[in-house]
């Protein structure tokens, strides 16, 4: 279909535009992008191993694969392709705000998934095809790790999912704490040591290289929000006063999957390059100096989010509580 389309349709053909718009609609619904995102948070009610498989690695990202596989059609309808990037940019920022006010540990990860798929849509919209699939792969590693680790937390806390009823768990479940640190660092794209940094940086570089500065800025805003809500969750769950007596998981069946995914969430996972040569078009590359500038900027943004999260939820918890109970805070939480 993709190969035959250029012989039968001219670029910008109305029928082709409607076809790609319908494909985009299916991808948006499948991958929980705005405005068809409402189902994803409720889907988190399933067991965490299921979430680790279908919400981190396979089912929810199928919309990304659909657009990447039919890229030839979208290249013939540049207006629809640009719309893909806009939807991704809006989704990644809005989902970041939503994750910042969640109290259920799995819902934080649900909105995080929505936001990260927004990055993939942004990459597709700026023709950074390889970067979209690369981030799909690295996201599968660290998000599966976070979902499995969250399941371990929930079981250790007697099926409690409210993060504000936890606290101080780093001493009772140290392996899971390490998993959250590694997975959270990868999700936040901590520079050089995590797989998420390399894939997310490729997306931002693709946006800049193709002249989509506004989408690149949205990606940087999303990166700040990501590190903020991720380490908010980690600091609330694992630091502070212990509120519940947790029972650590035992045995190789519990430890081994977490350890394997921890390793793949580091820079080791970024060494696994998907064999996409000849499958997807080449992406425009930035000059080396501009790449370095972008890497430093995105790294500073990620670290700034982590430091602010530490300042707010490790040092100024009363300030956060007062803001949350204020009229603007309640309005933001409702929104």
Range-by-range predicted roles:
Residues 4-7, 169, 207, 279, ...:
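Residues that form generic nucleotide/phosphate-binding pockets
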Residues 197, 247, 278, 320-322:
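Short coil/turn segments at secondary-structure boundaries
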Residues 247, 270-293:
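Polyanionic (Asp/Glu-rich) segments that form extended negatively charged tracts
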Residues 254-264, 283-335:
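Membrane-interface and transmembrane segments of multi-pass membrane proteins
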Residues 268-274, 311-314:
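Membrane-interface helix-loop junctions at the exits of transmembrane helices
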């Amino acid at each position: 279909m993709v190969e035959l389309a250029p012989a039968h349709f001219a670029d910008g053909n109305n029928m082709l535009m409607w076809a790609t718009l319908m494909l985009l609609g299916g991808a948006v619904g499948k991958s929980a992008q705005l405005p068809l995102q409402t189902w994803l948070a409720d889907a988190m009610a399933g067991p965490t191993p299921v979430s680790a498989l279908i919400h981190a690695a396979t089912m929810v990202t199928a919309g990304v694969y659909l657009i990447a596989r039919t890229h030839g059609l979208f290249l013939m309808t540049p207006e629809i392709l640009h719309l893909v990037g806009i939807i991704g940019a809006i989704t990644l920022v809005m989902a970041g705000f939503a994750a910042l006010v969640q109290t259920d540990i799995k819902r934080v990860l649900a909105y995080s998934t929505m936001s990260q798929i927004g990055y993939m849509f942004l990459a597709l919209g700026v023709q950074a095809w390889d970067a979209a699939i690369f981030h799909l792969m690295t996201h599968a590693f660290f998000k599966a790790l976070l979902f499995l680790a969250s399941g371990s937390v929930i079981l250790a806390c007697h099926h409690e999912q409210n993060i504000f009823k936890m606290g101080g768990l780093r001493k009772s479940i140290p392996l899971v704490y390490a998993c959250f640190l590694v997975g959270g660092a990868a999700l936040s794209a901590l520079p050089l040591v995590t797989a998420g940094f390399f894939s997310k940086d490729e997306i931002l570089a693709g946006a800049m290289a193709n002249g989509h500065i506004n989408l690149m800025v949205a990606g940087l805003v999303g990166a700040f929000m990501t590190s903020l809500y991720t380490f908010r969750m980690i600091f609330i769950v694992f630091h502070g006063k212990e509120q519940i007596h947790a029972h650590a998981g035992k045995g190789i069946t519990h430890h081994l999957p977490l350890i394997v995914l921890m390793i793949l969430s580091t820079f080791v996972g970024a060494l696994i390059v998907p064999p996409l040569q000849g499958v997807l078009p080449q992406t425009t590359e930035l000059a080396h100096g501009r790449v370095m500038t972008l890497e430093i900027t995105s790294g500073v943004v990620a670290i700034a989010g982590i430091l602010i999260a530490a300042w707010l939820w490790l040092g100024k918890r009363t300030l956060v509580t007062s803001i949350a109970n204020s009229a603007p805070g309640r309005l933001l939480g409702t929104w």
